[in-house]
Regions:
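Single, function-defining residue in the core of a domain
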Residues: 1-46, 53-62, 66-79, 84-326
Length: 326
């Protein structure tokens, strides 16, 4: 109903003109670095609106979630994966690695690789900070990186691989006030092989049963001062980033690419991230409750309507009446 009312106050008109394709591939001011800086500037300006104070109050450290998603496309410019299709083109993909501040739920760092690139390469891009804890899936397991994090006093939580080799050096007691889902809390040592030099790294391994998913998980971490159930709870925060990727793929799908090289694709993906960020800011700043999908649909339909967006979204009926009277 709101979108229909907005149509009645449209005072801009589109004229039939020949569509000129913008060259995303070669436009100097619109290269990926420029767009990524714009994304960062918007996040810095409006991050306080997106921030969830409950997470900040519960944790003394800055929690950052790391994950990746693969965007499939028929490409020859990136390293190809999979079989060739009927038309002879190889199905390639670009993988988007993102870092999300747990209290903001929008990417603060994005890095692109070919779909075939191993996830753990992204860990080299992360900034080490003694006040930060990174949370990532087991696809990012890299003992060399874990040793570097530990030496730099940077925390991490991840899942251990099924085929991981380790030695249990200590079994910690589980206090009565610890969540009953904690099944074990152990100190382990793993072997780190860095350029032929082998060392031992001490880590913490926690086994936890999650009632919601009805399965057990094994986590490894270098957080020796945290409660075992807190470490398990930290990892559960990581599932927020999966919801972000799902939200983008459902509401802002990259079905069509406007250029045929890596530069153009990166720019287009960054534009989607910026749109997602701006809509998130609008949604969070409104008193009236809007679902994200309805908000996206509204903006898509009325992109060329001349209306005060936030004013209209707060009270569509009232704003429509005022505009029709004028």
């Amino acid at each position: 109903m709101s979108t229909l009312k907005a149509d009645e106050i449209k005072n801009r008109k589109l004229f039939g003109k020949e569509y000129i394709k913008f060259n995303l591939e070669n436009g100097k001011p619109y290269r990926p670095n420029y767009i990524s800086k714009k994304h960062k500037q918007i996040l810095e300006k409006y991050g306080f609106i997106l921030s969830d104070s409950r997470i900040k109050e519960a944790l003394s450290k800055n929690v950052k979630i790391v994950d990746s998603t693969t965007i499939s496309l028929f490409k020859d410019i990136l390293k190809c994966v999979g079989r060739k299709s009927v038309d002879g083109k190889s199905k390639g993909g670009i993988k988007s690695h993102s870092v999300i501040n747990a209290d903001e739920k929008v990417p603060s760092l994005v890095w692109f690789t070919s779909a075939a690139t191993h996830d753990h390469q992204f860990l080299k891009k992360l900034k080490c900070d003694e006040h930060t804890v990174y949370i990532f899936d087991k696809g990012y397991n890299d003992y060399v990186a874990f040793e570097h994090f530990t030496n730099q006093k940077t925390g991490f939580v991840t899942r251990i691989k099924e085929n991981a080799k380790f030695e249990v050096t200590q079994k910690n007691d589980i206090p009565g006030n610890i969540h009953s889902g904690v099944l074990s809390d152990e100190i382990i040592e793993v072997e780190v092989n860095k350029e032929g030099v082998k060392t031992r790294l001490k880590l913490r391994k926690i086994k936890y049963y999650d009632r919601e998913h009805k399965r057990s998980f094994e986590f490894i971490s270098n957080l020796f001062d945290f409660r075992a159930d807190t470490i398990a709870a930290l990892y559960k925060i990581r599932w927020q980033i999966e919801l972000l990727f799902k939200q983008i793929k459902q509401n802002l799908p990259l079905k069509y690419f406007l250029g045929d090289n890596e530069n153009a694709i990166k720019i287009q993906i960054y534009c989607v991230l910026i749109v997602n960020l701006l809509l998130g800011v609008i949604k969070k700043s409104l008193k009236r409750k809007w679902s994200f999908s309805n908000l996206v649909s509204f903006c898509r339909i009325h992109l060329f309507n001349y209306i005060h967006l936030t004013k209209f979204l707060e009270s569509p009926e009232k704003d429509w009446e005022l505009n029709t009277q004028n």
